[in-house]
Amino acid sequence: MAEKPVDSLSESEAEAELKRLAEEIAGHDRRYHAEDAPTITDAEYDALRRRNLAIEERFPGLVREDSPSRRVGAPPAEGFAKVRHAVPMLSLAKAYTDEDVTDFIERGRRFFDRDKDLDIAFTAEPKIDGLSASLRYENGVFVQGATRGDGAVGEDITANLRTIADIPAKLKGSGWPDVIEIRGEVYMTYAEFEALKARSAAAGGQDYVNPRNTAAGSLRQKDASVTASRNLKFFAYAWGFTTADPAPTQYESVQKFADWGFKISPLMVRAKSVEELVAQYHLIEEQRSSLGYDIDGVVYKVDQLELQRRWGFVTGEPRWAVAHKFPAEQAMTTVQKIDIQVGRTGTLAPVARLAPVTVGGVVVENVTLHNEDYIKGFDSNGLPIRDGIDVRIGDTVVIQRAGDVIPQIVSVVIDKRPADAVPYEFPHTCPVCGSPATREINEKTGKEDSRRRCTGELICAAQAVERLRHFVSRGALDIEGLGAENIDTFFNAGLIKTAADIFTLRDRRPAVTKALAERREEQARQREAASGKTRKNVRSVEDRNYEGLDKLFAAIDSRREPELDRFIFALGIRHIGETTAAVLAKTFSTIEELIRVGKETAAAEDPHTVFPSVNGIGDTVIDALCDFFGNERNDDVLDKLLEQVKPKPYIVTVSADSEVAGKTIVFTGTLEKMTRSEAKAMAERLGAKVAGSVSAKTDLLVAGPGAGSKLKLASELGVEVIDEDTWLQRVGKA
């Protein structure tokens, strides 16, 4: 469905849209910054943020406390100590055309218009596509390093950063401030990435997607020796907290970094005009493919530090800097075949297998074709894509790595289409289990779903494997050591068919050992065949012992009492994501109560009138719960699972006699003694309701530094306003 124009949104529609955007963007931030696994292009992500900002500008009273405009990146991942940045690590505004760059320059000239004789200079440098890091030096000695995280709080990765040769343990030369935080980008070269992939393939290890994600994952290793083996690089380009400016200008400051022992970009230049900046942009773009590492644009900054300070910041971004993004790189190749993969909810996902081609330094061999309509040349709304030209086996296609991450087909070269190429016939049966694959009809719109789904459910091996992979994944039970490869091995060996079987693997240790040994033996034979070398002194399968099994079994046992929301998410119920699972856990408190209500709802003539009214749970989720709990085949699977796993009840302790019980509270601005989530949880425990926007129903506004439109609106409405210290005194936490 096409998005409704911002100018046409009602206040209630805008509020709902801001909620949706906050959740969706937070999910993408987490996948990009914390999990190193983005699922949308940079352009699509930027479009979401622009829409969010446009709605906020039209409805300033609806700005949420968790708004994307108030944060950068994602909260730091678990497993590392947290580091609060003394100076936030902000994102940059984006420019996509030369006209956008002109607008940036003109905004600066208008801002400084009162200084007619002011000579504004700029810098231009490549935007490295890696992982941002902040390095704290005290008296010239490296004492702490952190990731960007959410911009305010990052992860302490000091030990890992010390393994990077480009990061000096002690600054060279002299003249550095007593304390300075050097900021820059950790990245991996194409050569090192390909070497790592080759080493991993030879050892039967994991595959790696691209240099950016691999560098980020390498930097987050708990074992610093793993990071050291990855030969990561670092470019310095900025600074955070410092007791003194390195120099009067951006350019001179970065040159100082080189004097102190850092690598800096040799392509950084000064410029005075739009023409000079754009010329450098195109020069860097021409050299992009020969640099040996990923860049995704050029960053322009006002050169004079005094002018940077005067121009300031807006909505989490510096006004004095902009990132001019490159268009996605493209290449031409051929479609060799089209395969169908089956997901955990039965979705038939077509994948084009391509003649290998290098795009942006990465070899691309596969690209998703999304669904039946996409192959035919139409989007989910029936509108033409690729000029309405379908994709056929044998076609020559133009592909690009959207956002330099996700490969996609952008066009079909129709003049090169083979004479014998025929339209692709999308299967109407599951390629794995043979069950019918149907396109569901949306009861409200009467339209067909764009995706075909296998109706085999539990009898479909492909769905079973994907459900098992989901069950142990990071957002679900997060069982360490039980990744996709081990799940596949145990499933193919007949050791696990449902999630309950995972918890009895310890009892079948000999069979588990045999399955692992046979897999590794097969991998070794494949390497032997590829290399032409013959192994010597090969142990039999029965003679092998895997000490890591004890660790795996312990990890499995540690998940026998999971949090309720994680367990609900792990069940893999369609349309139940992490956020919805948390709402269900909070609403029903125990898995037994959720099952009871789910079965009652599924058995009702009109389920939507039976299911309790819960904020955040709509008809789509209710229908999904009915499908799951109303399916008798799921009963046995769930019963056996609950014999092995006892989810913890979701407990919310609420004080009904506190001073704020029953009141509606809004938090705004920067909280200095607790995080916003901690403040929200505290208020809810005390019986208060926490809202995201100020209205006539608001009883109390807790305002920290930087409070803006909410504070103004609260004053106009006569809402009581207090600061953080007063709030803590009022609730007895000072």
UniProtKB/Swiss-Prot annotation:
Keywords: DNA damage, DNA repair, DNA replication, Ligase, Magnesium, Manganese, Metal-binding, NAD, Zinc. GO terms for molecular function: DNA ligase (NAD+) activity; metal ion binding. Signal peptide: none annotated. It catalyses: NAD(+) + (deoxyribonucleotide)n-3'-hydroxyl + 5'-phospho-(deoxyribonucleotide)m = (deoxyribonucleotide)n+m + AMP + beta-nicotinamide D-nucleotide. Pfam families: BRCT, DNA_ligase_aden, DNA_ligase_OB, HHH_2. GO terms for cellular component: cytosol. Zn(2+) binds at C430, C433, C454, C460. Its cofactor is Mg(2+); Mn(2+). It is an enzyme of class 6 (ligase). The active site is at K127. NAD(+) binds at D42, A43, E44, Y45, D46, S91, L92, E125, R148, E185, K301, K325. Its EC number is 6.5.1.2. InterPro entries: BRCT_dom, BRCT_dom_sf, DisA/LigA_HHH, DNA_ligase, DNA_ligase_AS, DNAligase_adenylation, DNAligase_N, NA-bd_OB-fold. GO terms for biological process: DNA repair; DNA replication. The keyword Ribosomal protein does not apply. Belongs to the NAD-dependent DNA ligase family. LigA subfamily. NCBIfam families: dnlj, PRK07956.1. HAMAP family: DNA_ligase_A (MF_01588). DNA ligase that catalyzes the formation of phosphodiester linkages between 5'-phosphoryl and 3'-hydroxyl groups in double-stranded DNA using NAD as a coenzyme and as the energy source for the reaction. It is essential for DNA replication and repair of damaged DNA. This is DNA ligase.
